[in-house]
A protein has these predicted regions:
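Active-site neighborhoods and metal-handling regions in enzymes and metal-associated proteins
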Residues: 2-382
């Protein structure tokens, strides 16, 4: 669900110490050659982190990591970042200082790699200011999105990535009891979200978001925590997550404050049943839309089909939302190493909402949950 404001990325360690990273540039260059692309220009912290382990974006200062179809690499970076780039194992770094024109280095790159009339892919997160400047510097080049190429690599996690995601999931799981203990009448959504954030930080994660939606606010899937006080009997949706070395967790649990009505318990059981039905359908080769359908059919049969108005899940990794998307119309088959959320929900306007979310990884014989299993019954915090 929505990540809200991101906390700053602050993790960096040399490529040589990050299992799996060193081969990613080679795999990307092979994909570029197969797709007829001459070079890929990366500028986002996520894409750069995936390829090099250096989680940094240039912001107002131009920072580009170029990968050629022949495997060559070069970084054009602010002098402020050049030392870090070298430490990450990037051999060819062209630094520029404030007051200098970084496009001189782009012109050199175009000449050295014969890119002046080439096909150049860029990541979808590249700032428009970067792209416009690149198009002006290389006017005969054809620029296109490179995200489909990179997504093909990023959607399949290796064991080192899965280990980091398990750790992030475990931290989120272990933060939940603090929220349960603090969920009493009068505490505000914002205060409860702050407790979750502090607990994830204490446990060693980098908090990325914490959303608390109490009572009628829980019927708004995109609600952001505010100063609404939690009341006795409120159903409360908790959606939160953290990062470990850039890899994300994302968990949603629904609880009740003090006591729960039978209607709330019934809706919770329905959503839990839909969650389990979706999980049971996960295996390699199954179309992503089949997982969505499995959850949706359970809720529709109970008469709440119109109250489940979002997709069943989204991929997750270095991005909180990435491929594969678990939605009707996505016939792409699931593959071993895909990681995504399973998060059906029912939202009753003016009353409450219920959502249950776990992150799963597709395995050869089904799936693995990367965080603890949800309760089959609505938990009452007292």
């Amino acid at each position: 669900m929505p990540p809200g404001e991101q906390f700053p990325r602050c993790h960096t360690r040399p490529v040589a110490t990050i299992p799996g990273v060193s081969g990613r540039v080679d795999r990307l260059s092979r994909e570029l050659a197969e797709d007829g692309v001459d070079a890929f220009f990366v500028s986002s912290a996520v894409s750069l982190g995936y390829l090099t382990g250096m989680h940094e974006a240039g912001g107002e200062r131009l920072l580009i990591f170029a990968v050629g179809r022949d495997g060559r690499t070069r970084m054009i970076a602010p002098a402020l970042s050049a030392t870090q780039a070298g430490r990450m194992g990037i051999a060819d770094v062209r630094p520029w200082r404030d007051g200098e024109n970084p496009m001189v280095h782009v012109d050199d790159l175009g000449r050295d790699w014969n890119l002046r009339s080439a096909v150049i892919a860029v990541d979808d997160d590249m700032p428009a200011s970067y792209l416009l400047a690149l198009q002006e510097a290389l006017p005969a080049a054809l620029f296109r999105t490179g995200q489909p190429v990179l997504s093909r690599l990023m959607r399949i996690k290796d064991q080192s990535e899965l280990d980091l995601m398990r750790r992030a999931g475990r931290i989120a799981d272990e933060a939940l009891p603090a929220a349960l203990a603090a969920c009493t009448q009068g505490v505000t959504e914002r205060e409860l979200a702050s407790i979750l954030t502090a607990e994830m930080l204490r446990l060693g994660g980098t908090p990325t978001f914490a959303i608390v939606a109490a009572g009628a606010n829980g019927a708004e899937p995109h609600h952001h925590s505010d100063d609404t006080p939690i009341r006795e009997g409120d159903v409360v949706v908790l959606d939160f997550g953290c990062q470990v070395e850039g890899y994300n967790s994302d968990i949603t649990r629904t609880i009740a404050c003090g006591h729960a009505t039978e209607e709330a318990r019934e809706v919770y059981r329905l959503v839990f049943t839909a969650h389990q039905a979706a999980r049971a359908a996960i295996r390699p080769g199954v179309p992503a839309e089949a997982i969505d359908r499995a959850a949706r059919e359970v809720i529709a049969r109970a008469g709440h089909g119109e109250r489940f108005m979002h997709r069943t899940g989204h991929g997750i990794g270095l991005r909180i939302h990435e491929e594969p998307y678990i939605i009707e119309g996505n016939a792409s088959p699931l593959e071993v190493g895909n990681c995504f959320s399973v998060e059906p929900g029912v939202y009753l306007p003016g009353q409450f909402g219920v959502r249950i979310e776990n992150i799963v990884a597709v395995t050869s014989d089904g799936h693995e949950s990367l965080n603890a299993e949800p309760s089959p019954e609505l938990i009452v915090a007292s």
